[in-house]
Amino acid sequence: ETGLDSMSFMTVDRDLQQNAGMKKVIHTYTYKGAVEAVAEGKATTEKAKLTFEEKEYTVKVKQEEFEYTDEQFMKDPMVLEAGLKGAATSMVNDLNKDFFDEIAKTTTLSTYTDAIKYDDIVDAIAKMNLEDETGLFVLINPKQKAEIRKDADFKASRMGEIIHSGQIGDISGIPVAVSKKVPADTVFVATKEAVTCFVKKEVEVEQDRIKNKRINSIIPRKVGLVALTDATKAVKITKA
């Protein structure tokens, strides 16, 4: 799996925590209109139009369960701690999987040849047509780490403040982070607006027990959804 904290690369929407329901509807608005010069007593010749695209997202309940017996606990009390740690790791891995599955769906695409370098990142950013590049990040897999580190711009960049967990430095002024979840020969350039984590319920842990069998259950549970909500804010770069 990966040690990357994917939550820091997403927008987190907790609106559903304050409202009843399991669905979140998002409208993307498009305004078309132009300012006209008008003569005295005359009206504009065309009216502006506002349209919107509606997308509905339904959160999911996700949980897992592990069991241990009283006898196991008496033999080794660490079984409970180890089980809780394993369950927490499993929850994080599930979130990371959802994030990388969603960001890979972006329809904004670019390519590179040989090794990933500064120019490839610049070309990918250009496809996003951004005025403000604040918040951009680059995600690579471990095998590409050496390629990035050999890039002249990367070597010349500052290696100071670490903005994201897993970050190895900057390229073109953009933080570069490494994850095993990034597919081979693939690079993602994105902002947090690309993928949204809709949270209905934070992770909670419920316990149960079958008394006459001395079987204890630990059930971690979360309610939410990870979705690609703005494909224009993520570029998928693949090797040509």
Role assignments for model-derived ranges:
Residues 34-37, 76, 147-150, 227-229:
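Short helix/loop capping segments that flank catalytic or ligand/cofactor-binding pockets
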